[in-house]
Each structure stands twice: as C-alpha cells, then as structure tokens.
Amino acid sequence: MTTNTQEINFQQQELKGRDFLTLADYTKDEINYLIDLADYLKKQHKDGVIFEPLKGKTLGMIFEKSSTRTRVSFETGIYQLGGLGIFLSSKDIQIGRGETIADTAKVLSGYLDGIMIRTFAQEDVEELAKHASIPVINGLTDLYHPCQVLADLQTIKEVKGKLHGVKLVYIGDGNNMTHSLMLGAAKTGMHMVAVTPDGYTPNKEVLTKAKSIANQHGAIIEWTSDIATAVQEADVIYTDVWASMGQEEEQQQREKDFENYQVNESLLEKAKTDVIFMHCLPAHRGEEVTAGVIDGKQSVVFQQAENRLHAQKALMTALMAD
C-alpha cells in the first residue's frame, strides 16, 4: 500500500458542512464534482493508495429500514477514509418516538461528525437536518434515494463517457428511485422517460420540479405508460422491484399490474444496440427483470453496486473532511 495521492485535475467545489437530502439541493457543477471525486477515489483504491481525510471522524448510521448495500458501502467507505462508522438500528434509536427528532439531532451532533439516516419519511430526515449542527446524509426515504442515484450517474458516465444527452428509460413503479433519477437526470442534462402503469405514476410535485430543473439544463423529463415507444433509442434501461419494503401485502396485485413491464431480452432489442441495463438491487429475478438480462453482457448492475462505495466515499469526503 502507498500513501501517495494522485493529482486532482478536476474543478473542486466547497461542500464542507452541507447536508445531502435530495439532488435538487445541489447544482450541476456540484453533482459533477462529486462524480469526479468518486472516480478519483475509485482509482486511488484500485491503485492501493491509502487516503484518510476522515481520520478521527465518526459517522452515525441510523437504519430504520434494513439494507445490505447502504450499510456495507457506508461502513466500509468511512473505514477506508480513516474514520469510524457506528451502526444504530431501530432498536437503538427511534426517530420521533419517545425522544423528539430535534433532541436526537442535537445530542448526536455533540458526539458525531456526520449522520447517515435510512428511514421512511422524508420529513423526518429534513427535521433531523434542521436541528443537527453536523452534515446529514439521506441514505433512503420513501420519497428519495439520492445516494443510489449519485452512484448511478457515476456508472453511466463511466460506461457512456458522458451524461448530457444520454437517454435513460426507467420502467416500473414511480417510487423513490424514479424521483431521484428524475432529479439527477434533470440536473445533468439527460433525457429521462419514466414508464409506469396507470396508478403508479411518480409524485406529481417531484415530476413538476424535475421538469422545471430540466428546462434550465437542456434536459428532458417525461412520463408515459407506453413502454414500446419509450425504449426506442434508449442508452440506458433501468428498473426496480415491483413491491418495495413495506409493500409486501400488495405483492400479488402489483405482479398483475406490472406483468407487461418486465425488462427482458426482447425489450432490450428495441433499444440501441449498445444499451446498458441498470438495477439498484436487490432484484427479484423473473419478476421485474429476467435472469438473462441481469446476468447478460449489457448489464452493469454489479459495477453500479460497487460504485455505491466510491460515490459515498466522495460524499463523505466532501461534506466531512477538514
């Protein structure tokens, strides 16, 4: 291992002390900086370089929703950056139940250097950030999943060489992934089409916001239920589970409603020949995507999953490093 860092040759942004609650809060330049920093840290890691800008720093990780990728990538990431991650489950801390969110935020601010929270209500994350004096990172809510999309944008840029003008077609439920993808695509000048069945459309307020942002950045954000037309000329096809955590009772109805929205080999053939397939994982093989697609040569899902580590290392470095 070496401690020699490589020269940073991209435009830096000052983000120290900021919260990361939604991509709508960040400019195009700031998002591109985080992607460039993620690429830089990924290369450092692959080259065996020790880089510890968070030595002596501690991140509290609050999980009211369980996760594989979010916990492992954040905990591994802060360790690689020289810091410490403390896992707090719903048994250890109950946001808004018993002790108020405001009191929790103030107490944790006295112990920690940053908070990552994965929970249900976006309002709880915003309340935590309002009263915390340290950076708060949204690890997922029912409304947004910005950390995942930061890694997604990094992955698309790695494979396609750019973001501006890239056509991304999201197929499935109009959920937190859809919302954050729309905001990320709007900020970076992409053309995104969200394809959902009637009754599963994205949040109207978020869709309106994304379209407004898109107008400022030369992006296009659309919604349709016509899957065949949407995937034409697609550079990226993206999907997610049909029933998210907490929606298990709706599983049978959702399987019926989404049966014509599966990503399979014949669907990929309708897109560009060099289309890539993405999924935030975990995947339910045989439901929203076939095994042939997720394991096929056009799939980048495991590269995408790995980039959660590098994108979040970039985020923690930018927000928490001295």
From Swiss-Prot:
Task: Write down any Gene Ontology CC term.
Answer: cytoplasm
Judging by the UniProt lineage, the source's domain of life is Bacteria
The UniProt entry, under InterPro entries, shows: Asp/Orn_carbamoyltranf_P-bd, Asp/Orn_carbamoylTrfase, Asp/Orn_carbamoylTrfase_sf, Asp_carbamoyltransf_Asp/Orn-bd, Orn/put_carbamltrans, OTCase_ArgI
What's the Enzyme Commission number for this chain?
2.1.3.3
Query: Where carbamoyl phosphate is bound, by residue?
Result: 67-70, 94, 118, 145-148, 280-281, 308
Q: Name one molecular function that GO assigns to this entry.
A: ornithine carbamoyltransferase activity
Positions that bind L-ornithine: 176, 240, 244-245
Q: Which UniProt keywords apply?
A: Amino-acid biosynthesis, Arginine biosynthesis, Cytoplasm, Transferase
Where found in the cell? Cytoplasm
Give a single Pfam family match.
OTCace
Is Transferase there in the keyword field?
yes
Top-level EC class as recorded in UniProt = transferase
Where does this protein act, in terms of pathway? Answer: Amino-acid biosynthesis; L-arginine biosynthesis; L-arginine from L-ornithine and carbamoyl phosphate: step 1/3
Coiled coil ranges (UniProt) are none
User: What is the documented function of this protein?
Assistant: Reversibly catalyzes the transfer of the carbamoyl group from carbamoyl phosphate (CP) to the N(epsilon) atom of ornithine (ORN) to produce L-citrulline.
Q: What is the name of the protein in this document?
A: Ornithine carbamoyltransferase
The opening ranks of the lineage are: Bacteria, Bacillati, Bacillota, Bacilli, Bacillales
